[in-house]
């Protein structure tokens, strides 16, 4: 069966590193690298299959790396050559991380980061479509934040899209962002309440962790300061199907000998 075969027997992968402008309005200025991986089924190489480019969620996550013949990539490669793009700033596409930005002045950094939004992500895709794969149209799959990229693509370059699949992340068309945030706040409160109802010990552990952070200078493995706000960002896990259990088990392992454990700090950093 395909599951028992090596990935090389199932897929052909072709990697591209492409130089694109940081700012498309000034293409002669600074360039950045964009990494994209073409994944095709070996059995379909003789077919002229269309292209499907995948926009990952996050924002900030790299494109998936196929490690098994399963999931949506298995299904998509039956009908498409799948293009897995590391959106600018992620993965192998001029990644934004502490190492890459540590020498940038604050004002320059703020301007630099402004070029890593959905509008330029789709311009990268257009550059690749036209200059690397030379096709007039292709299809798009957007997951979570990738759905915002897909909608952006539909707004600016609809003539080059065949089909658009969105599995989450649809921006409001006529509502103000504040309305979305107000609705989100209510959802967050409900999620927190439910979390502590299911795992009452987690509430005690969370307070213990918060008190420790408030009273001590805590640093993460990369040197960043662990603030209360950074700790609160773990609530992002409540949006995942198994997130409540994940958080509860993480809080259980937060302390060793009265100090925040290395395991806990590494998980916060992840």
Predicted regions and their residues:
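Single conserved hydrophobic/aromatic residue that forms the stacking wall/gate
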Residues: 1-11
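Gly/Pro-rich cap/lid or specificity-loop segments adjacent to the active site
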Residues: 9-223
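Alpha/beta-hydrolase fold active-site neighborhood
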Residues: 218-270
